[in-house]
UniProtKB/Swiss-Prot annotation:
Function noted in UniProt: Catalyzes the phosphorylation of methylthioribose into methylthioribose-1-phosphate.
Keyword Nucleotide-binding: yes
Binding site for substrate: D225, R332
Chain coiled-coil ranges: none
E.C. code: 2.7.1.100
Name of this chain's protein: Methylthioribose kinase
EC class of the enzyme, as a word: transferase
Highest classification ranks of the organism: Bacteria, Bacillati, Bacillota, Bacilli, Bacillales
GO-annotated biological processes: L-methionine salvage from methylthioadenosine
Family: Belongs to the methylthioribose kinase family.
GO molecular function, one term: ATP binding
Keyword Mitochondrion carried by entry: no
Chain sites annotated for binding ATP: N38, K53, E107, D108, L109, D242, P243, E244
UniProt KW keywords: Amino-acid biosynthesis, ATP-binding, Kinase, Methionine biosynthesis, Nucleotide-binding, Transferase
Amino acid sequence: MGYYALTETTAIQYAKEHGYFEKKANVFCHEIGDGNLNYVFKLDDGEKSIIIKQALPYAKVVGESWPLSIKRATIESKALKIFAKYVPDYVPVVHSHDEELAVTVIEDLSRLTITRKGLIDGEEYPLLSQHIGRFLANVLFYTSDFGLQSEEKRGLEGTFVNPDLCKITEDLVFTDPFGHYDTNDYEPELQLAVDELWSDKTLKLKVAQYKYKFLTRKEALIHGDLHTGSIFSSPSETKVIDPEFATYGPFGFDLGQFIANLLLNALSREEEQRSVLFFHIEKTWSYFVDTFTKLWIGEGVEAYTKEKQWLPIILQNIFTDVVGFAGCELIRRTIGLAHVADLDEIANKEKRIQAKKQALYLGKELIKYESKNADIQLFRTLFQQTVSGGVKA
């Protein structure tokens, strides 16, 4: 029959035909997706529920003028299964995948909340940083040359060649926000700050270097889009979803994106409400380093993991990349395509513009920062300098 886009009615038919519900069951279905690329249906018969996710052959956020390969659904399904191999507690269960229809049937996580929404609403997730730090350390280590035999790693690199989605990252994270491109989207009040950003040659040179790292460093399997909208949370659970951007890339990319989105949420808050975000930023890195170190010592397969001086160099290189990638994400989410609600939903216009100017300034400072001795406190330090340094609406 070939590919066709599901509707709520045909999603129910699909689920029944594949044995997820009895033929006579009274199944309710709602399209719940709020993302930019896919349909997401929740199906429930009162006793059990599932999620059906279908990739569209174009970007939903733009329309059919932006075609995309539906093979990204297969990449997402395979990535979730690899994540589950190493950290099953932190990803949803994949029930099945239909490559022809680009349909994946996965566990319903309705008991949890999208982390971005929860943070905006002031909810607290005490285990978020522990879970994300451990998730990233395990996935990145075990899919890298340090935890995987080189021939197996090269095979995985081929599995996760993801040209359409990587091109989106190349353009929307590293290129378009730093110049005159039609995809950019920002308020007129930001024009002066944007002009200053676009004319900063030092900044552009640094961004070029980070883009080149993304293009060329095939260090480990990365999620590729790990923002707080790609995570479900509760006070006791964390589940990473939507790895359709998965590819082999730099160790520090996912960490940088995650931390940047915590910073964006911090910018939307009053000063007395920000400490929990910096707790999560610092603890994410701490849990990542501790877990990665234990795996390096106990599970390393590469000969030079036995050299004690090698690991600190690797971790410092990762941290340098985390800082720069976080800066790129801050700028992209402020003036590029696909904003975040953390900033866009600030009700007071003056405060919203001020927060966005601060995001641009902080992003520039992170990208341009150079020090071989920096530690995770850098994010708190530069943030405080930004919000107290006179960046006004």
